[in-house]
């Protein structure tokens, strides 16, 4: 019914503007009907093309999002790996420094104890010699008393 209203409106407009009476069976109205049909078909085809384009754009945007997410994950993983390596190196360097400090302390204490150990060894040797002499003297005293 809407198409009939449009045709009636068109007939009135032609009569008002151009002063010509046009009937429903006039060839000019056939052209108008064909033109309206072509425009409807064109609009439908354009809508289908727009829908396909929209779908393709959404697909591309989704792929870009996935790509960006993948790149972000790879970047984060690389940063984490680099951080882990740096922490490991730092811990190794700290352990080496601590071991070196302990070694130097042990060497310093050992160097300080060398002289007292020598002195203790000398005193022990003298005690052993004195003990040996006491045993020999006791042995001589025992032999002399027999």
UniProtKB/Swiss-Prot annotation:
Highest taxon above the source species: Bacteria
Coiled coil: none
GO terms under biological process: quorum sensing
InterPro entries, sorted: TraM (IPR028140)
Protein's UniProt keywords contain Isomerase: no
Pfam families recorded: Activator-TraM (PF11657)
Assigned keywords, A-Z: Conjugation, Plasmid
NCBIfam families with a match to the protein in the record: PRK13895.1
Entry's family note: To plasmid IncP-alpha RP4 TraM.
Identification of the protein by name: Protein TraM
Gene designation per UniProt: traM
